[in-house]
Each structure stands twice: as C-alpha cells, then as structure tokens.
Amino acid sequence: NLGSAFLANKTNRMFVSRKEKENWNMYVMDLDKFFADVKQGKVGKPSAYETFIGTFPTEMGRPGGYAVDCNDDYAYITVEREGTEEEKERMMKNAFLPESNQPVKIKPTLCGIRKMNLSTGEVTKVIDTEFKTGHIQASRFTPGEIVFCNETGGDAHQRMWFCTADGTVFKPLYKETPLDWVTHETFATKDFVYFNILGFQPRLRKQASGIVRINLRTDDVELIGQVELEKDRQAIDGQLVGRGFWHCNASRDNKWAVGDTFGGNVWLINVQTGERHWLVSDTKMKPDHAHPSFSPDGTKVLFQSGHFTNGKRLNLMMVDISSFK
C-alpha cells in the first residue's frame, strides 16, 4: 500500500503518506538505495528503504492531500475539521450555488491546512478555511508559499487562494467575476500561477477565456491564449470538441505554456509571442485527462494518452520541443 507519494526537491528521496489502521503516517524513502537493490535484483521489504517521520494527530483534523516545500522541510497537508456552529452557518451561507444544469459534486466542508516538520514529525496549524480545500501546491522556488483551491467539483465564487506557511498571508488569488469559471491552477514558476478560465459553455464565451497567468507579486493578470472554440459550431450536442482549454502548465522559464483541450488535443503556446503549435491530437481524455507538463529544463512536454488503447488505459507520452523557437 504505497499511499500518496511526493518526490523530494533536493535529494533522491520520496515522501510517502499511508493510512495504517487509524493512523495517518508519513515516511521518507531512500530511492538511491532502492534502485541500487533493483539493479542487483535483490529488493527488500519497504522497511529496508523507508524511515518513519511522524503520525498526524487526530485532533488536528482529518488529513487529505499534501505538497512538500521547496526545501523539503515541511509537508503542507489539507484537512477536514469539525469547527464551530458559527463557522458551519457562515460556510453554508457563503457556499456556491451552481447553475440549474450544474450538479453539486463536492459539498462544502470546514477545512484547513496544517504543516508537518519532515525532520521531527511535529504538526502545527497554518490556516483554517470555511470551504472544501484541495489541489494544494507549494512553490518549487520560494519557501513557505502555498496555492490551493475551493474544491466544488465545478465552478466556485472564488476558486484560487494563496497563503504563507506561517499563516500571516491568506487571500484570494485572482478575484473572479460571475462569468469566470476558473480551474486547474498550477504553481508553475517562481512568480506566476497559470490557470484556465473555461469557455466550454455558450454563456462563458461572452468574455475572454483560455490559459491565463497571474503575477503573485503584483496581482497583474495576462491572457496567454485560447484555441478550438470555432469548432463548437460544428459539434454534435454532447461532444467535447470545440470547448477550448481544460488543463494547463508552463515551463519554469515562462517561455512556454501548454494546455489540453476538451477535444483531447495538446497545444503549445509561446508566452512571449502568442504563437500556437498543435502538438498532439486524439488523446481520448479517458480514462483520465492529458494533463500536460514540462520537464524541468523546459525542452520536453509530458502527457497522458488513451489514444493507443481506445481510452481503456493510459500511456505516458513525451514530445521533444527543443527545436521550437
């Protein structure tokens, strides 16, 4: 039972969380030792490679997903919590009410973020929230910077949020308008968070949509690009072609952005010039989405594809973009 895994940023290790009986435990795995044994054909038990870090205290909440700080000092962990009756009343009063044709996939829940010291196992509070907190990400470049979302399974009044690990900063990131359907934010570079404003419904195409980025230091917002919306007029009802971008990412030098579309295509965009390149088609977007991302040096795009299995299983695919200008 591997549980949730997160590769360390500084060393060849992997942090692993595991639910064992009633405990949520964190371990760190020595990958150098593990792969050396794999090479020799003598892999041992998990205990031969893992070191126990700590157990999450039950009084701190029910832990969920987590991200690891860029210095590998802390894990930032989302939790569900009980809270007070006053908090629950505020939560329900402020909860997002979707359009009539949108299901409520994830109900609001009192949540928060805790941090675990990855040397000592100590757990302390970062912030409490009054909405379902998910998609937590830590900056790969600046210690103590955290991006997360109000997870509804669909639209939200305000999806993206930012906080610092000491809890002194806790604020909305990109203040939304009623026609903004924000999704799939990614803490891609030192100063920018990239995200999508969806255009997959006619009502959403009455303003700009596509891949967008926000500057964490200035709150300035830039539209990077959109594709394929013109195909919507040719689509049969129920098809996902012509709905624009769904997920996005960016290279660490901010030169390139990449996105997959509802129709299963992957596009590359030059952030400086706006030039668009159609990299891949027909990833099927099932059994999961393409979710493209970049190699650390920005020369390759990695994505998932169900193309070769007719959507039954996923293959990991990679495209070399080093020749693109």
Which residue ranges define each predicted feature?
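Asp-box/WD-like beta-propeller blade repeats and closely related beta-sheet repeat scaffolds
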Residues: S17-G112, G121, K125-D128
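Blade-level signature of beta-propeller repeat domains, shared across WD40, Kelch, NHL, RCC1
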Residues: H289-K325
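Structural motif
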Residues: E22-D30, E85-R90, P108-R114, D155-W161, ...
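Loop-centered beta-sheet repeat module
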Residues: K125-F170
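Conserved beta-propeller blade repeats
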Residues: N1-S17, I53-A75, E130-C149, T177-N196, ...
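Multi-bladed beta-propeller domains
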Residues: N1, L31-G61, M116-K132, C163-W181, ...
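Beta-strand C-termini and the immediately following turn/loop, strongest in propeller blades
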Residues: F15-K21, M29-L31, Y76-E82, V104-K107, ...
